[in-house]
Amino acid sequence: MQKPSIPKGTRDFSPEEMAKRNYIFNTIREVFHLYGFQQIETPAMENLSTLMGKYGEEGDKLLFKILNSGDCFAGISDEELMEKNPLRFAAKACEKGLRYDLTVPFARYVVQHRNEISFPFKRYQIQPVWRADRPQKGRYREFYQCDGDVVGSDSLINEVELIQIMDEVFHRFGIRVCIKMNNRKILSGIAEIIGEADKIVDITVAIDKLDKIGLDNVNEELRSKGLPEEAIERLQPIIMLQGSNQEKIATLKKVLSASETGLKGVAELDFILERISHTSIRAELELDLTLARGLNYYTGAIFEVKALDVQIGSITGGGRYDNLTGVFGMEGVSGVGFSFGADRIFDVLNQLDLYPEGSLKTTQLLFVNFGQKEEIHLLPLIAKVRKAGIRTELYPESTKMKKQMGYADAKKIPFVAIVGENEMAENKINLKNMLTGEQTLVTIEELIERF
């Protein structure tokens, strides 16, 4: 008989892992609600016409396509089958696919429900996505995304609030972070003033690797992309700019004085930093001119969050974008959004052991089962305990005490309630602390007060 297994690139989550994941998602939800965000969900499957062409040719290959039910070969000729062209086959045999991310379904949602939505629309979404990628360490075919966006508003106050949300979430987790920020317009201005505006993608892809590969290798990559030495020399002092955020802003105003686009980006960052100075954020906030994520997507501010006490990639990222819904025929809907990296946050909290003790325990109290007479006596007591909000179990069978205690140990249940004939006669409960072994005779009211 074949041993049961799961597809490569997917995961099972144990009760303990789910308790940790729920702590992460519930914390994020609470903060989103504080800022007026509303939750939506979209179907796991979308029409392929919604998904195809939105992620580039490589992205289209990574879409999980769903075969049409019934005769999926209907309308496909023998010649087309013999051709063995997967994309052409999928175009006829598949009308639906699993969502690749939460952004395109969100854009579809906004267009489809535009008459019901109040703009600006603050939305968050926590759902799994699927990618037909090659599984490897840290890369999965099924994983959760946790996105927040404000659409239908150009106000930079939205960027300020997103920084506050990131700061509050990581403060609640107890993770020390640095929130890095840049602006797509500044990157365009830099490429413009060094005379290489048409090579902005090559420039930004290279400088984004500065932390990982060092300046010499960045320069070598720029040379390989055809940048002249003069342009590379002019770029050096800009990307290596030091000082406080305000000192960097002052320098950029001078350096980018000949670029209208660049100066607009500087003004936007200056506004965000000035407004943030009137809040009480605890995270480090750093203007990083090498930050260049999502270049083909973001049009204004760019954000990235790094954990300070763990060597790991970014744990949150986002930015300002224009025309989110243009691909669906609704022009001019701009917004700003970001995504929490749930799996990386999970890893950071594990490495730093930052999960609050109460967040991981399911059952707080186990009642030992001695038999039918005791069960009848215990059921109203257990109902009273649960009504007080104490997570409680009654062991389902009257088996050996050792087995019941072993169950409590295995589930890390901190307290066990023992009610035998003597306790029933006195209308008391023998409460055992499983950590210390201490036992105390208490009334039901005294038991409830202890939790």
UniProtKB/Swiss-Prot annotation:
Alphabetized, the UniProt keywords read: Aminoacyl-tRNA synthetase, ATP-binding, Cytoplasm, Ligase, Nucleotide-binding, Protein biosynthesis
Concerning InterPro entries, the annotation shows: aa-tRNA-synth_II (IPR006195), aa-tRNA-synth_II/BPL/LPL (IPR045864), Anticodon-bd (IPR004154), Anticodon-bd_dom_sf (IPR036621), His-tRNA-ligase (IPR015807), HisRS-like_core (IPR041715), HisRS/HisZ (IPR004516), HisRS_anticodon (IPR033656)
Q: Does the keyword Acyltransferase apply?
A: no
MF (Gene Ontology): ATP binding; histidine-tRNA ligase activity
Tell me its EC number(s), please.
6.1.1.21
| Gene Ontology biological-process annotations | histidyl-tRNA aminoacylation
So which domain of life are we looking at? Bacteria
Output a single Gene Ontology CC term carried by this record. cytoplasm
Q: Which PANTHER family match?
A: HISTIDINE--TRNA LIGASE, HISTIDYL-TRNA SYNTHETASE
Q: How does it assemble?
A: Homodimer.
Name of protein:
Histidine--tRNA ligase
What organism is recorded for this protein?
Parabacteroides distasonis (strain ATCC 8503 / DSM 20701 / CIP 104284 / JCM 5825 / NCTC 11152)
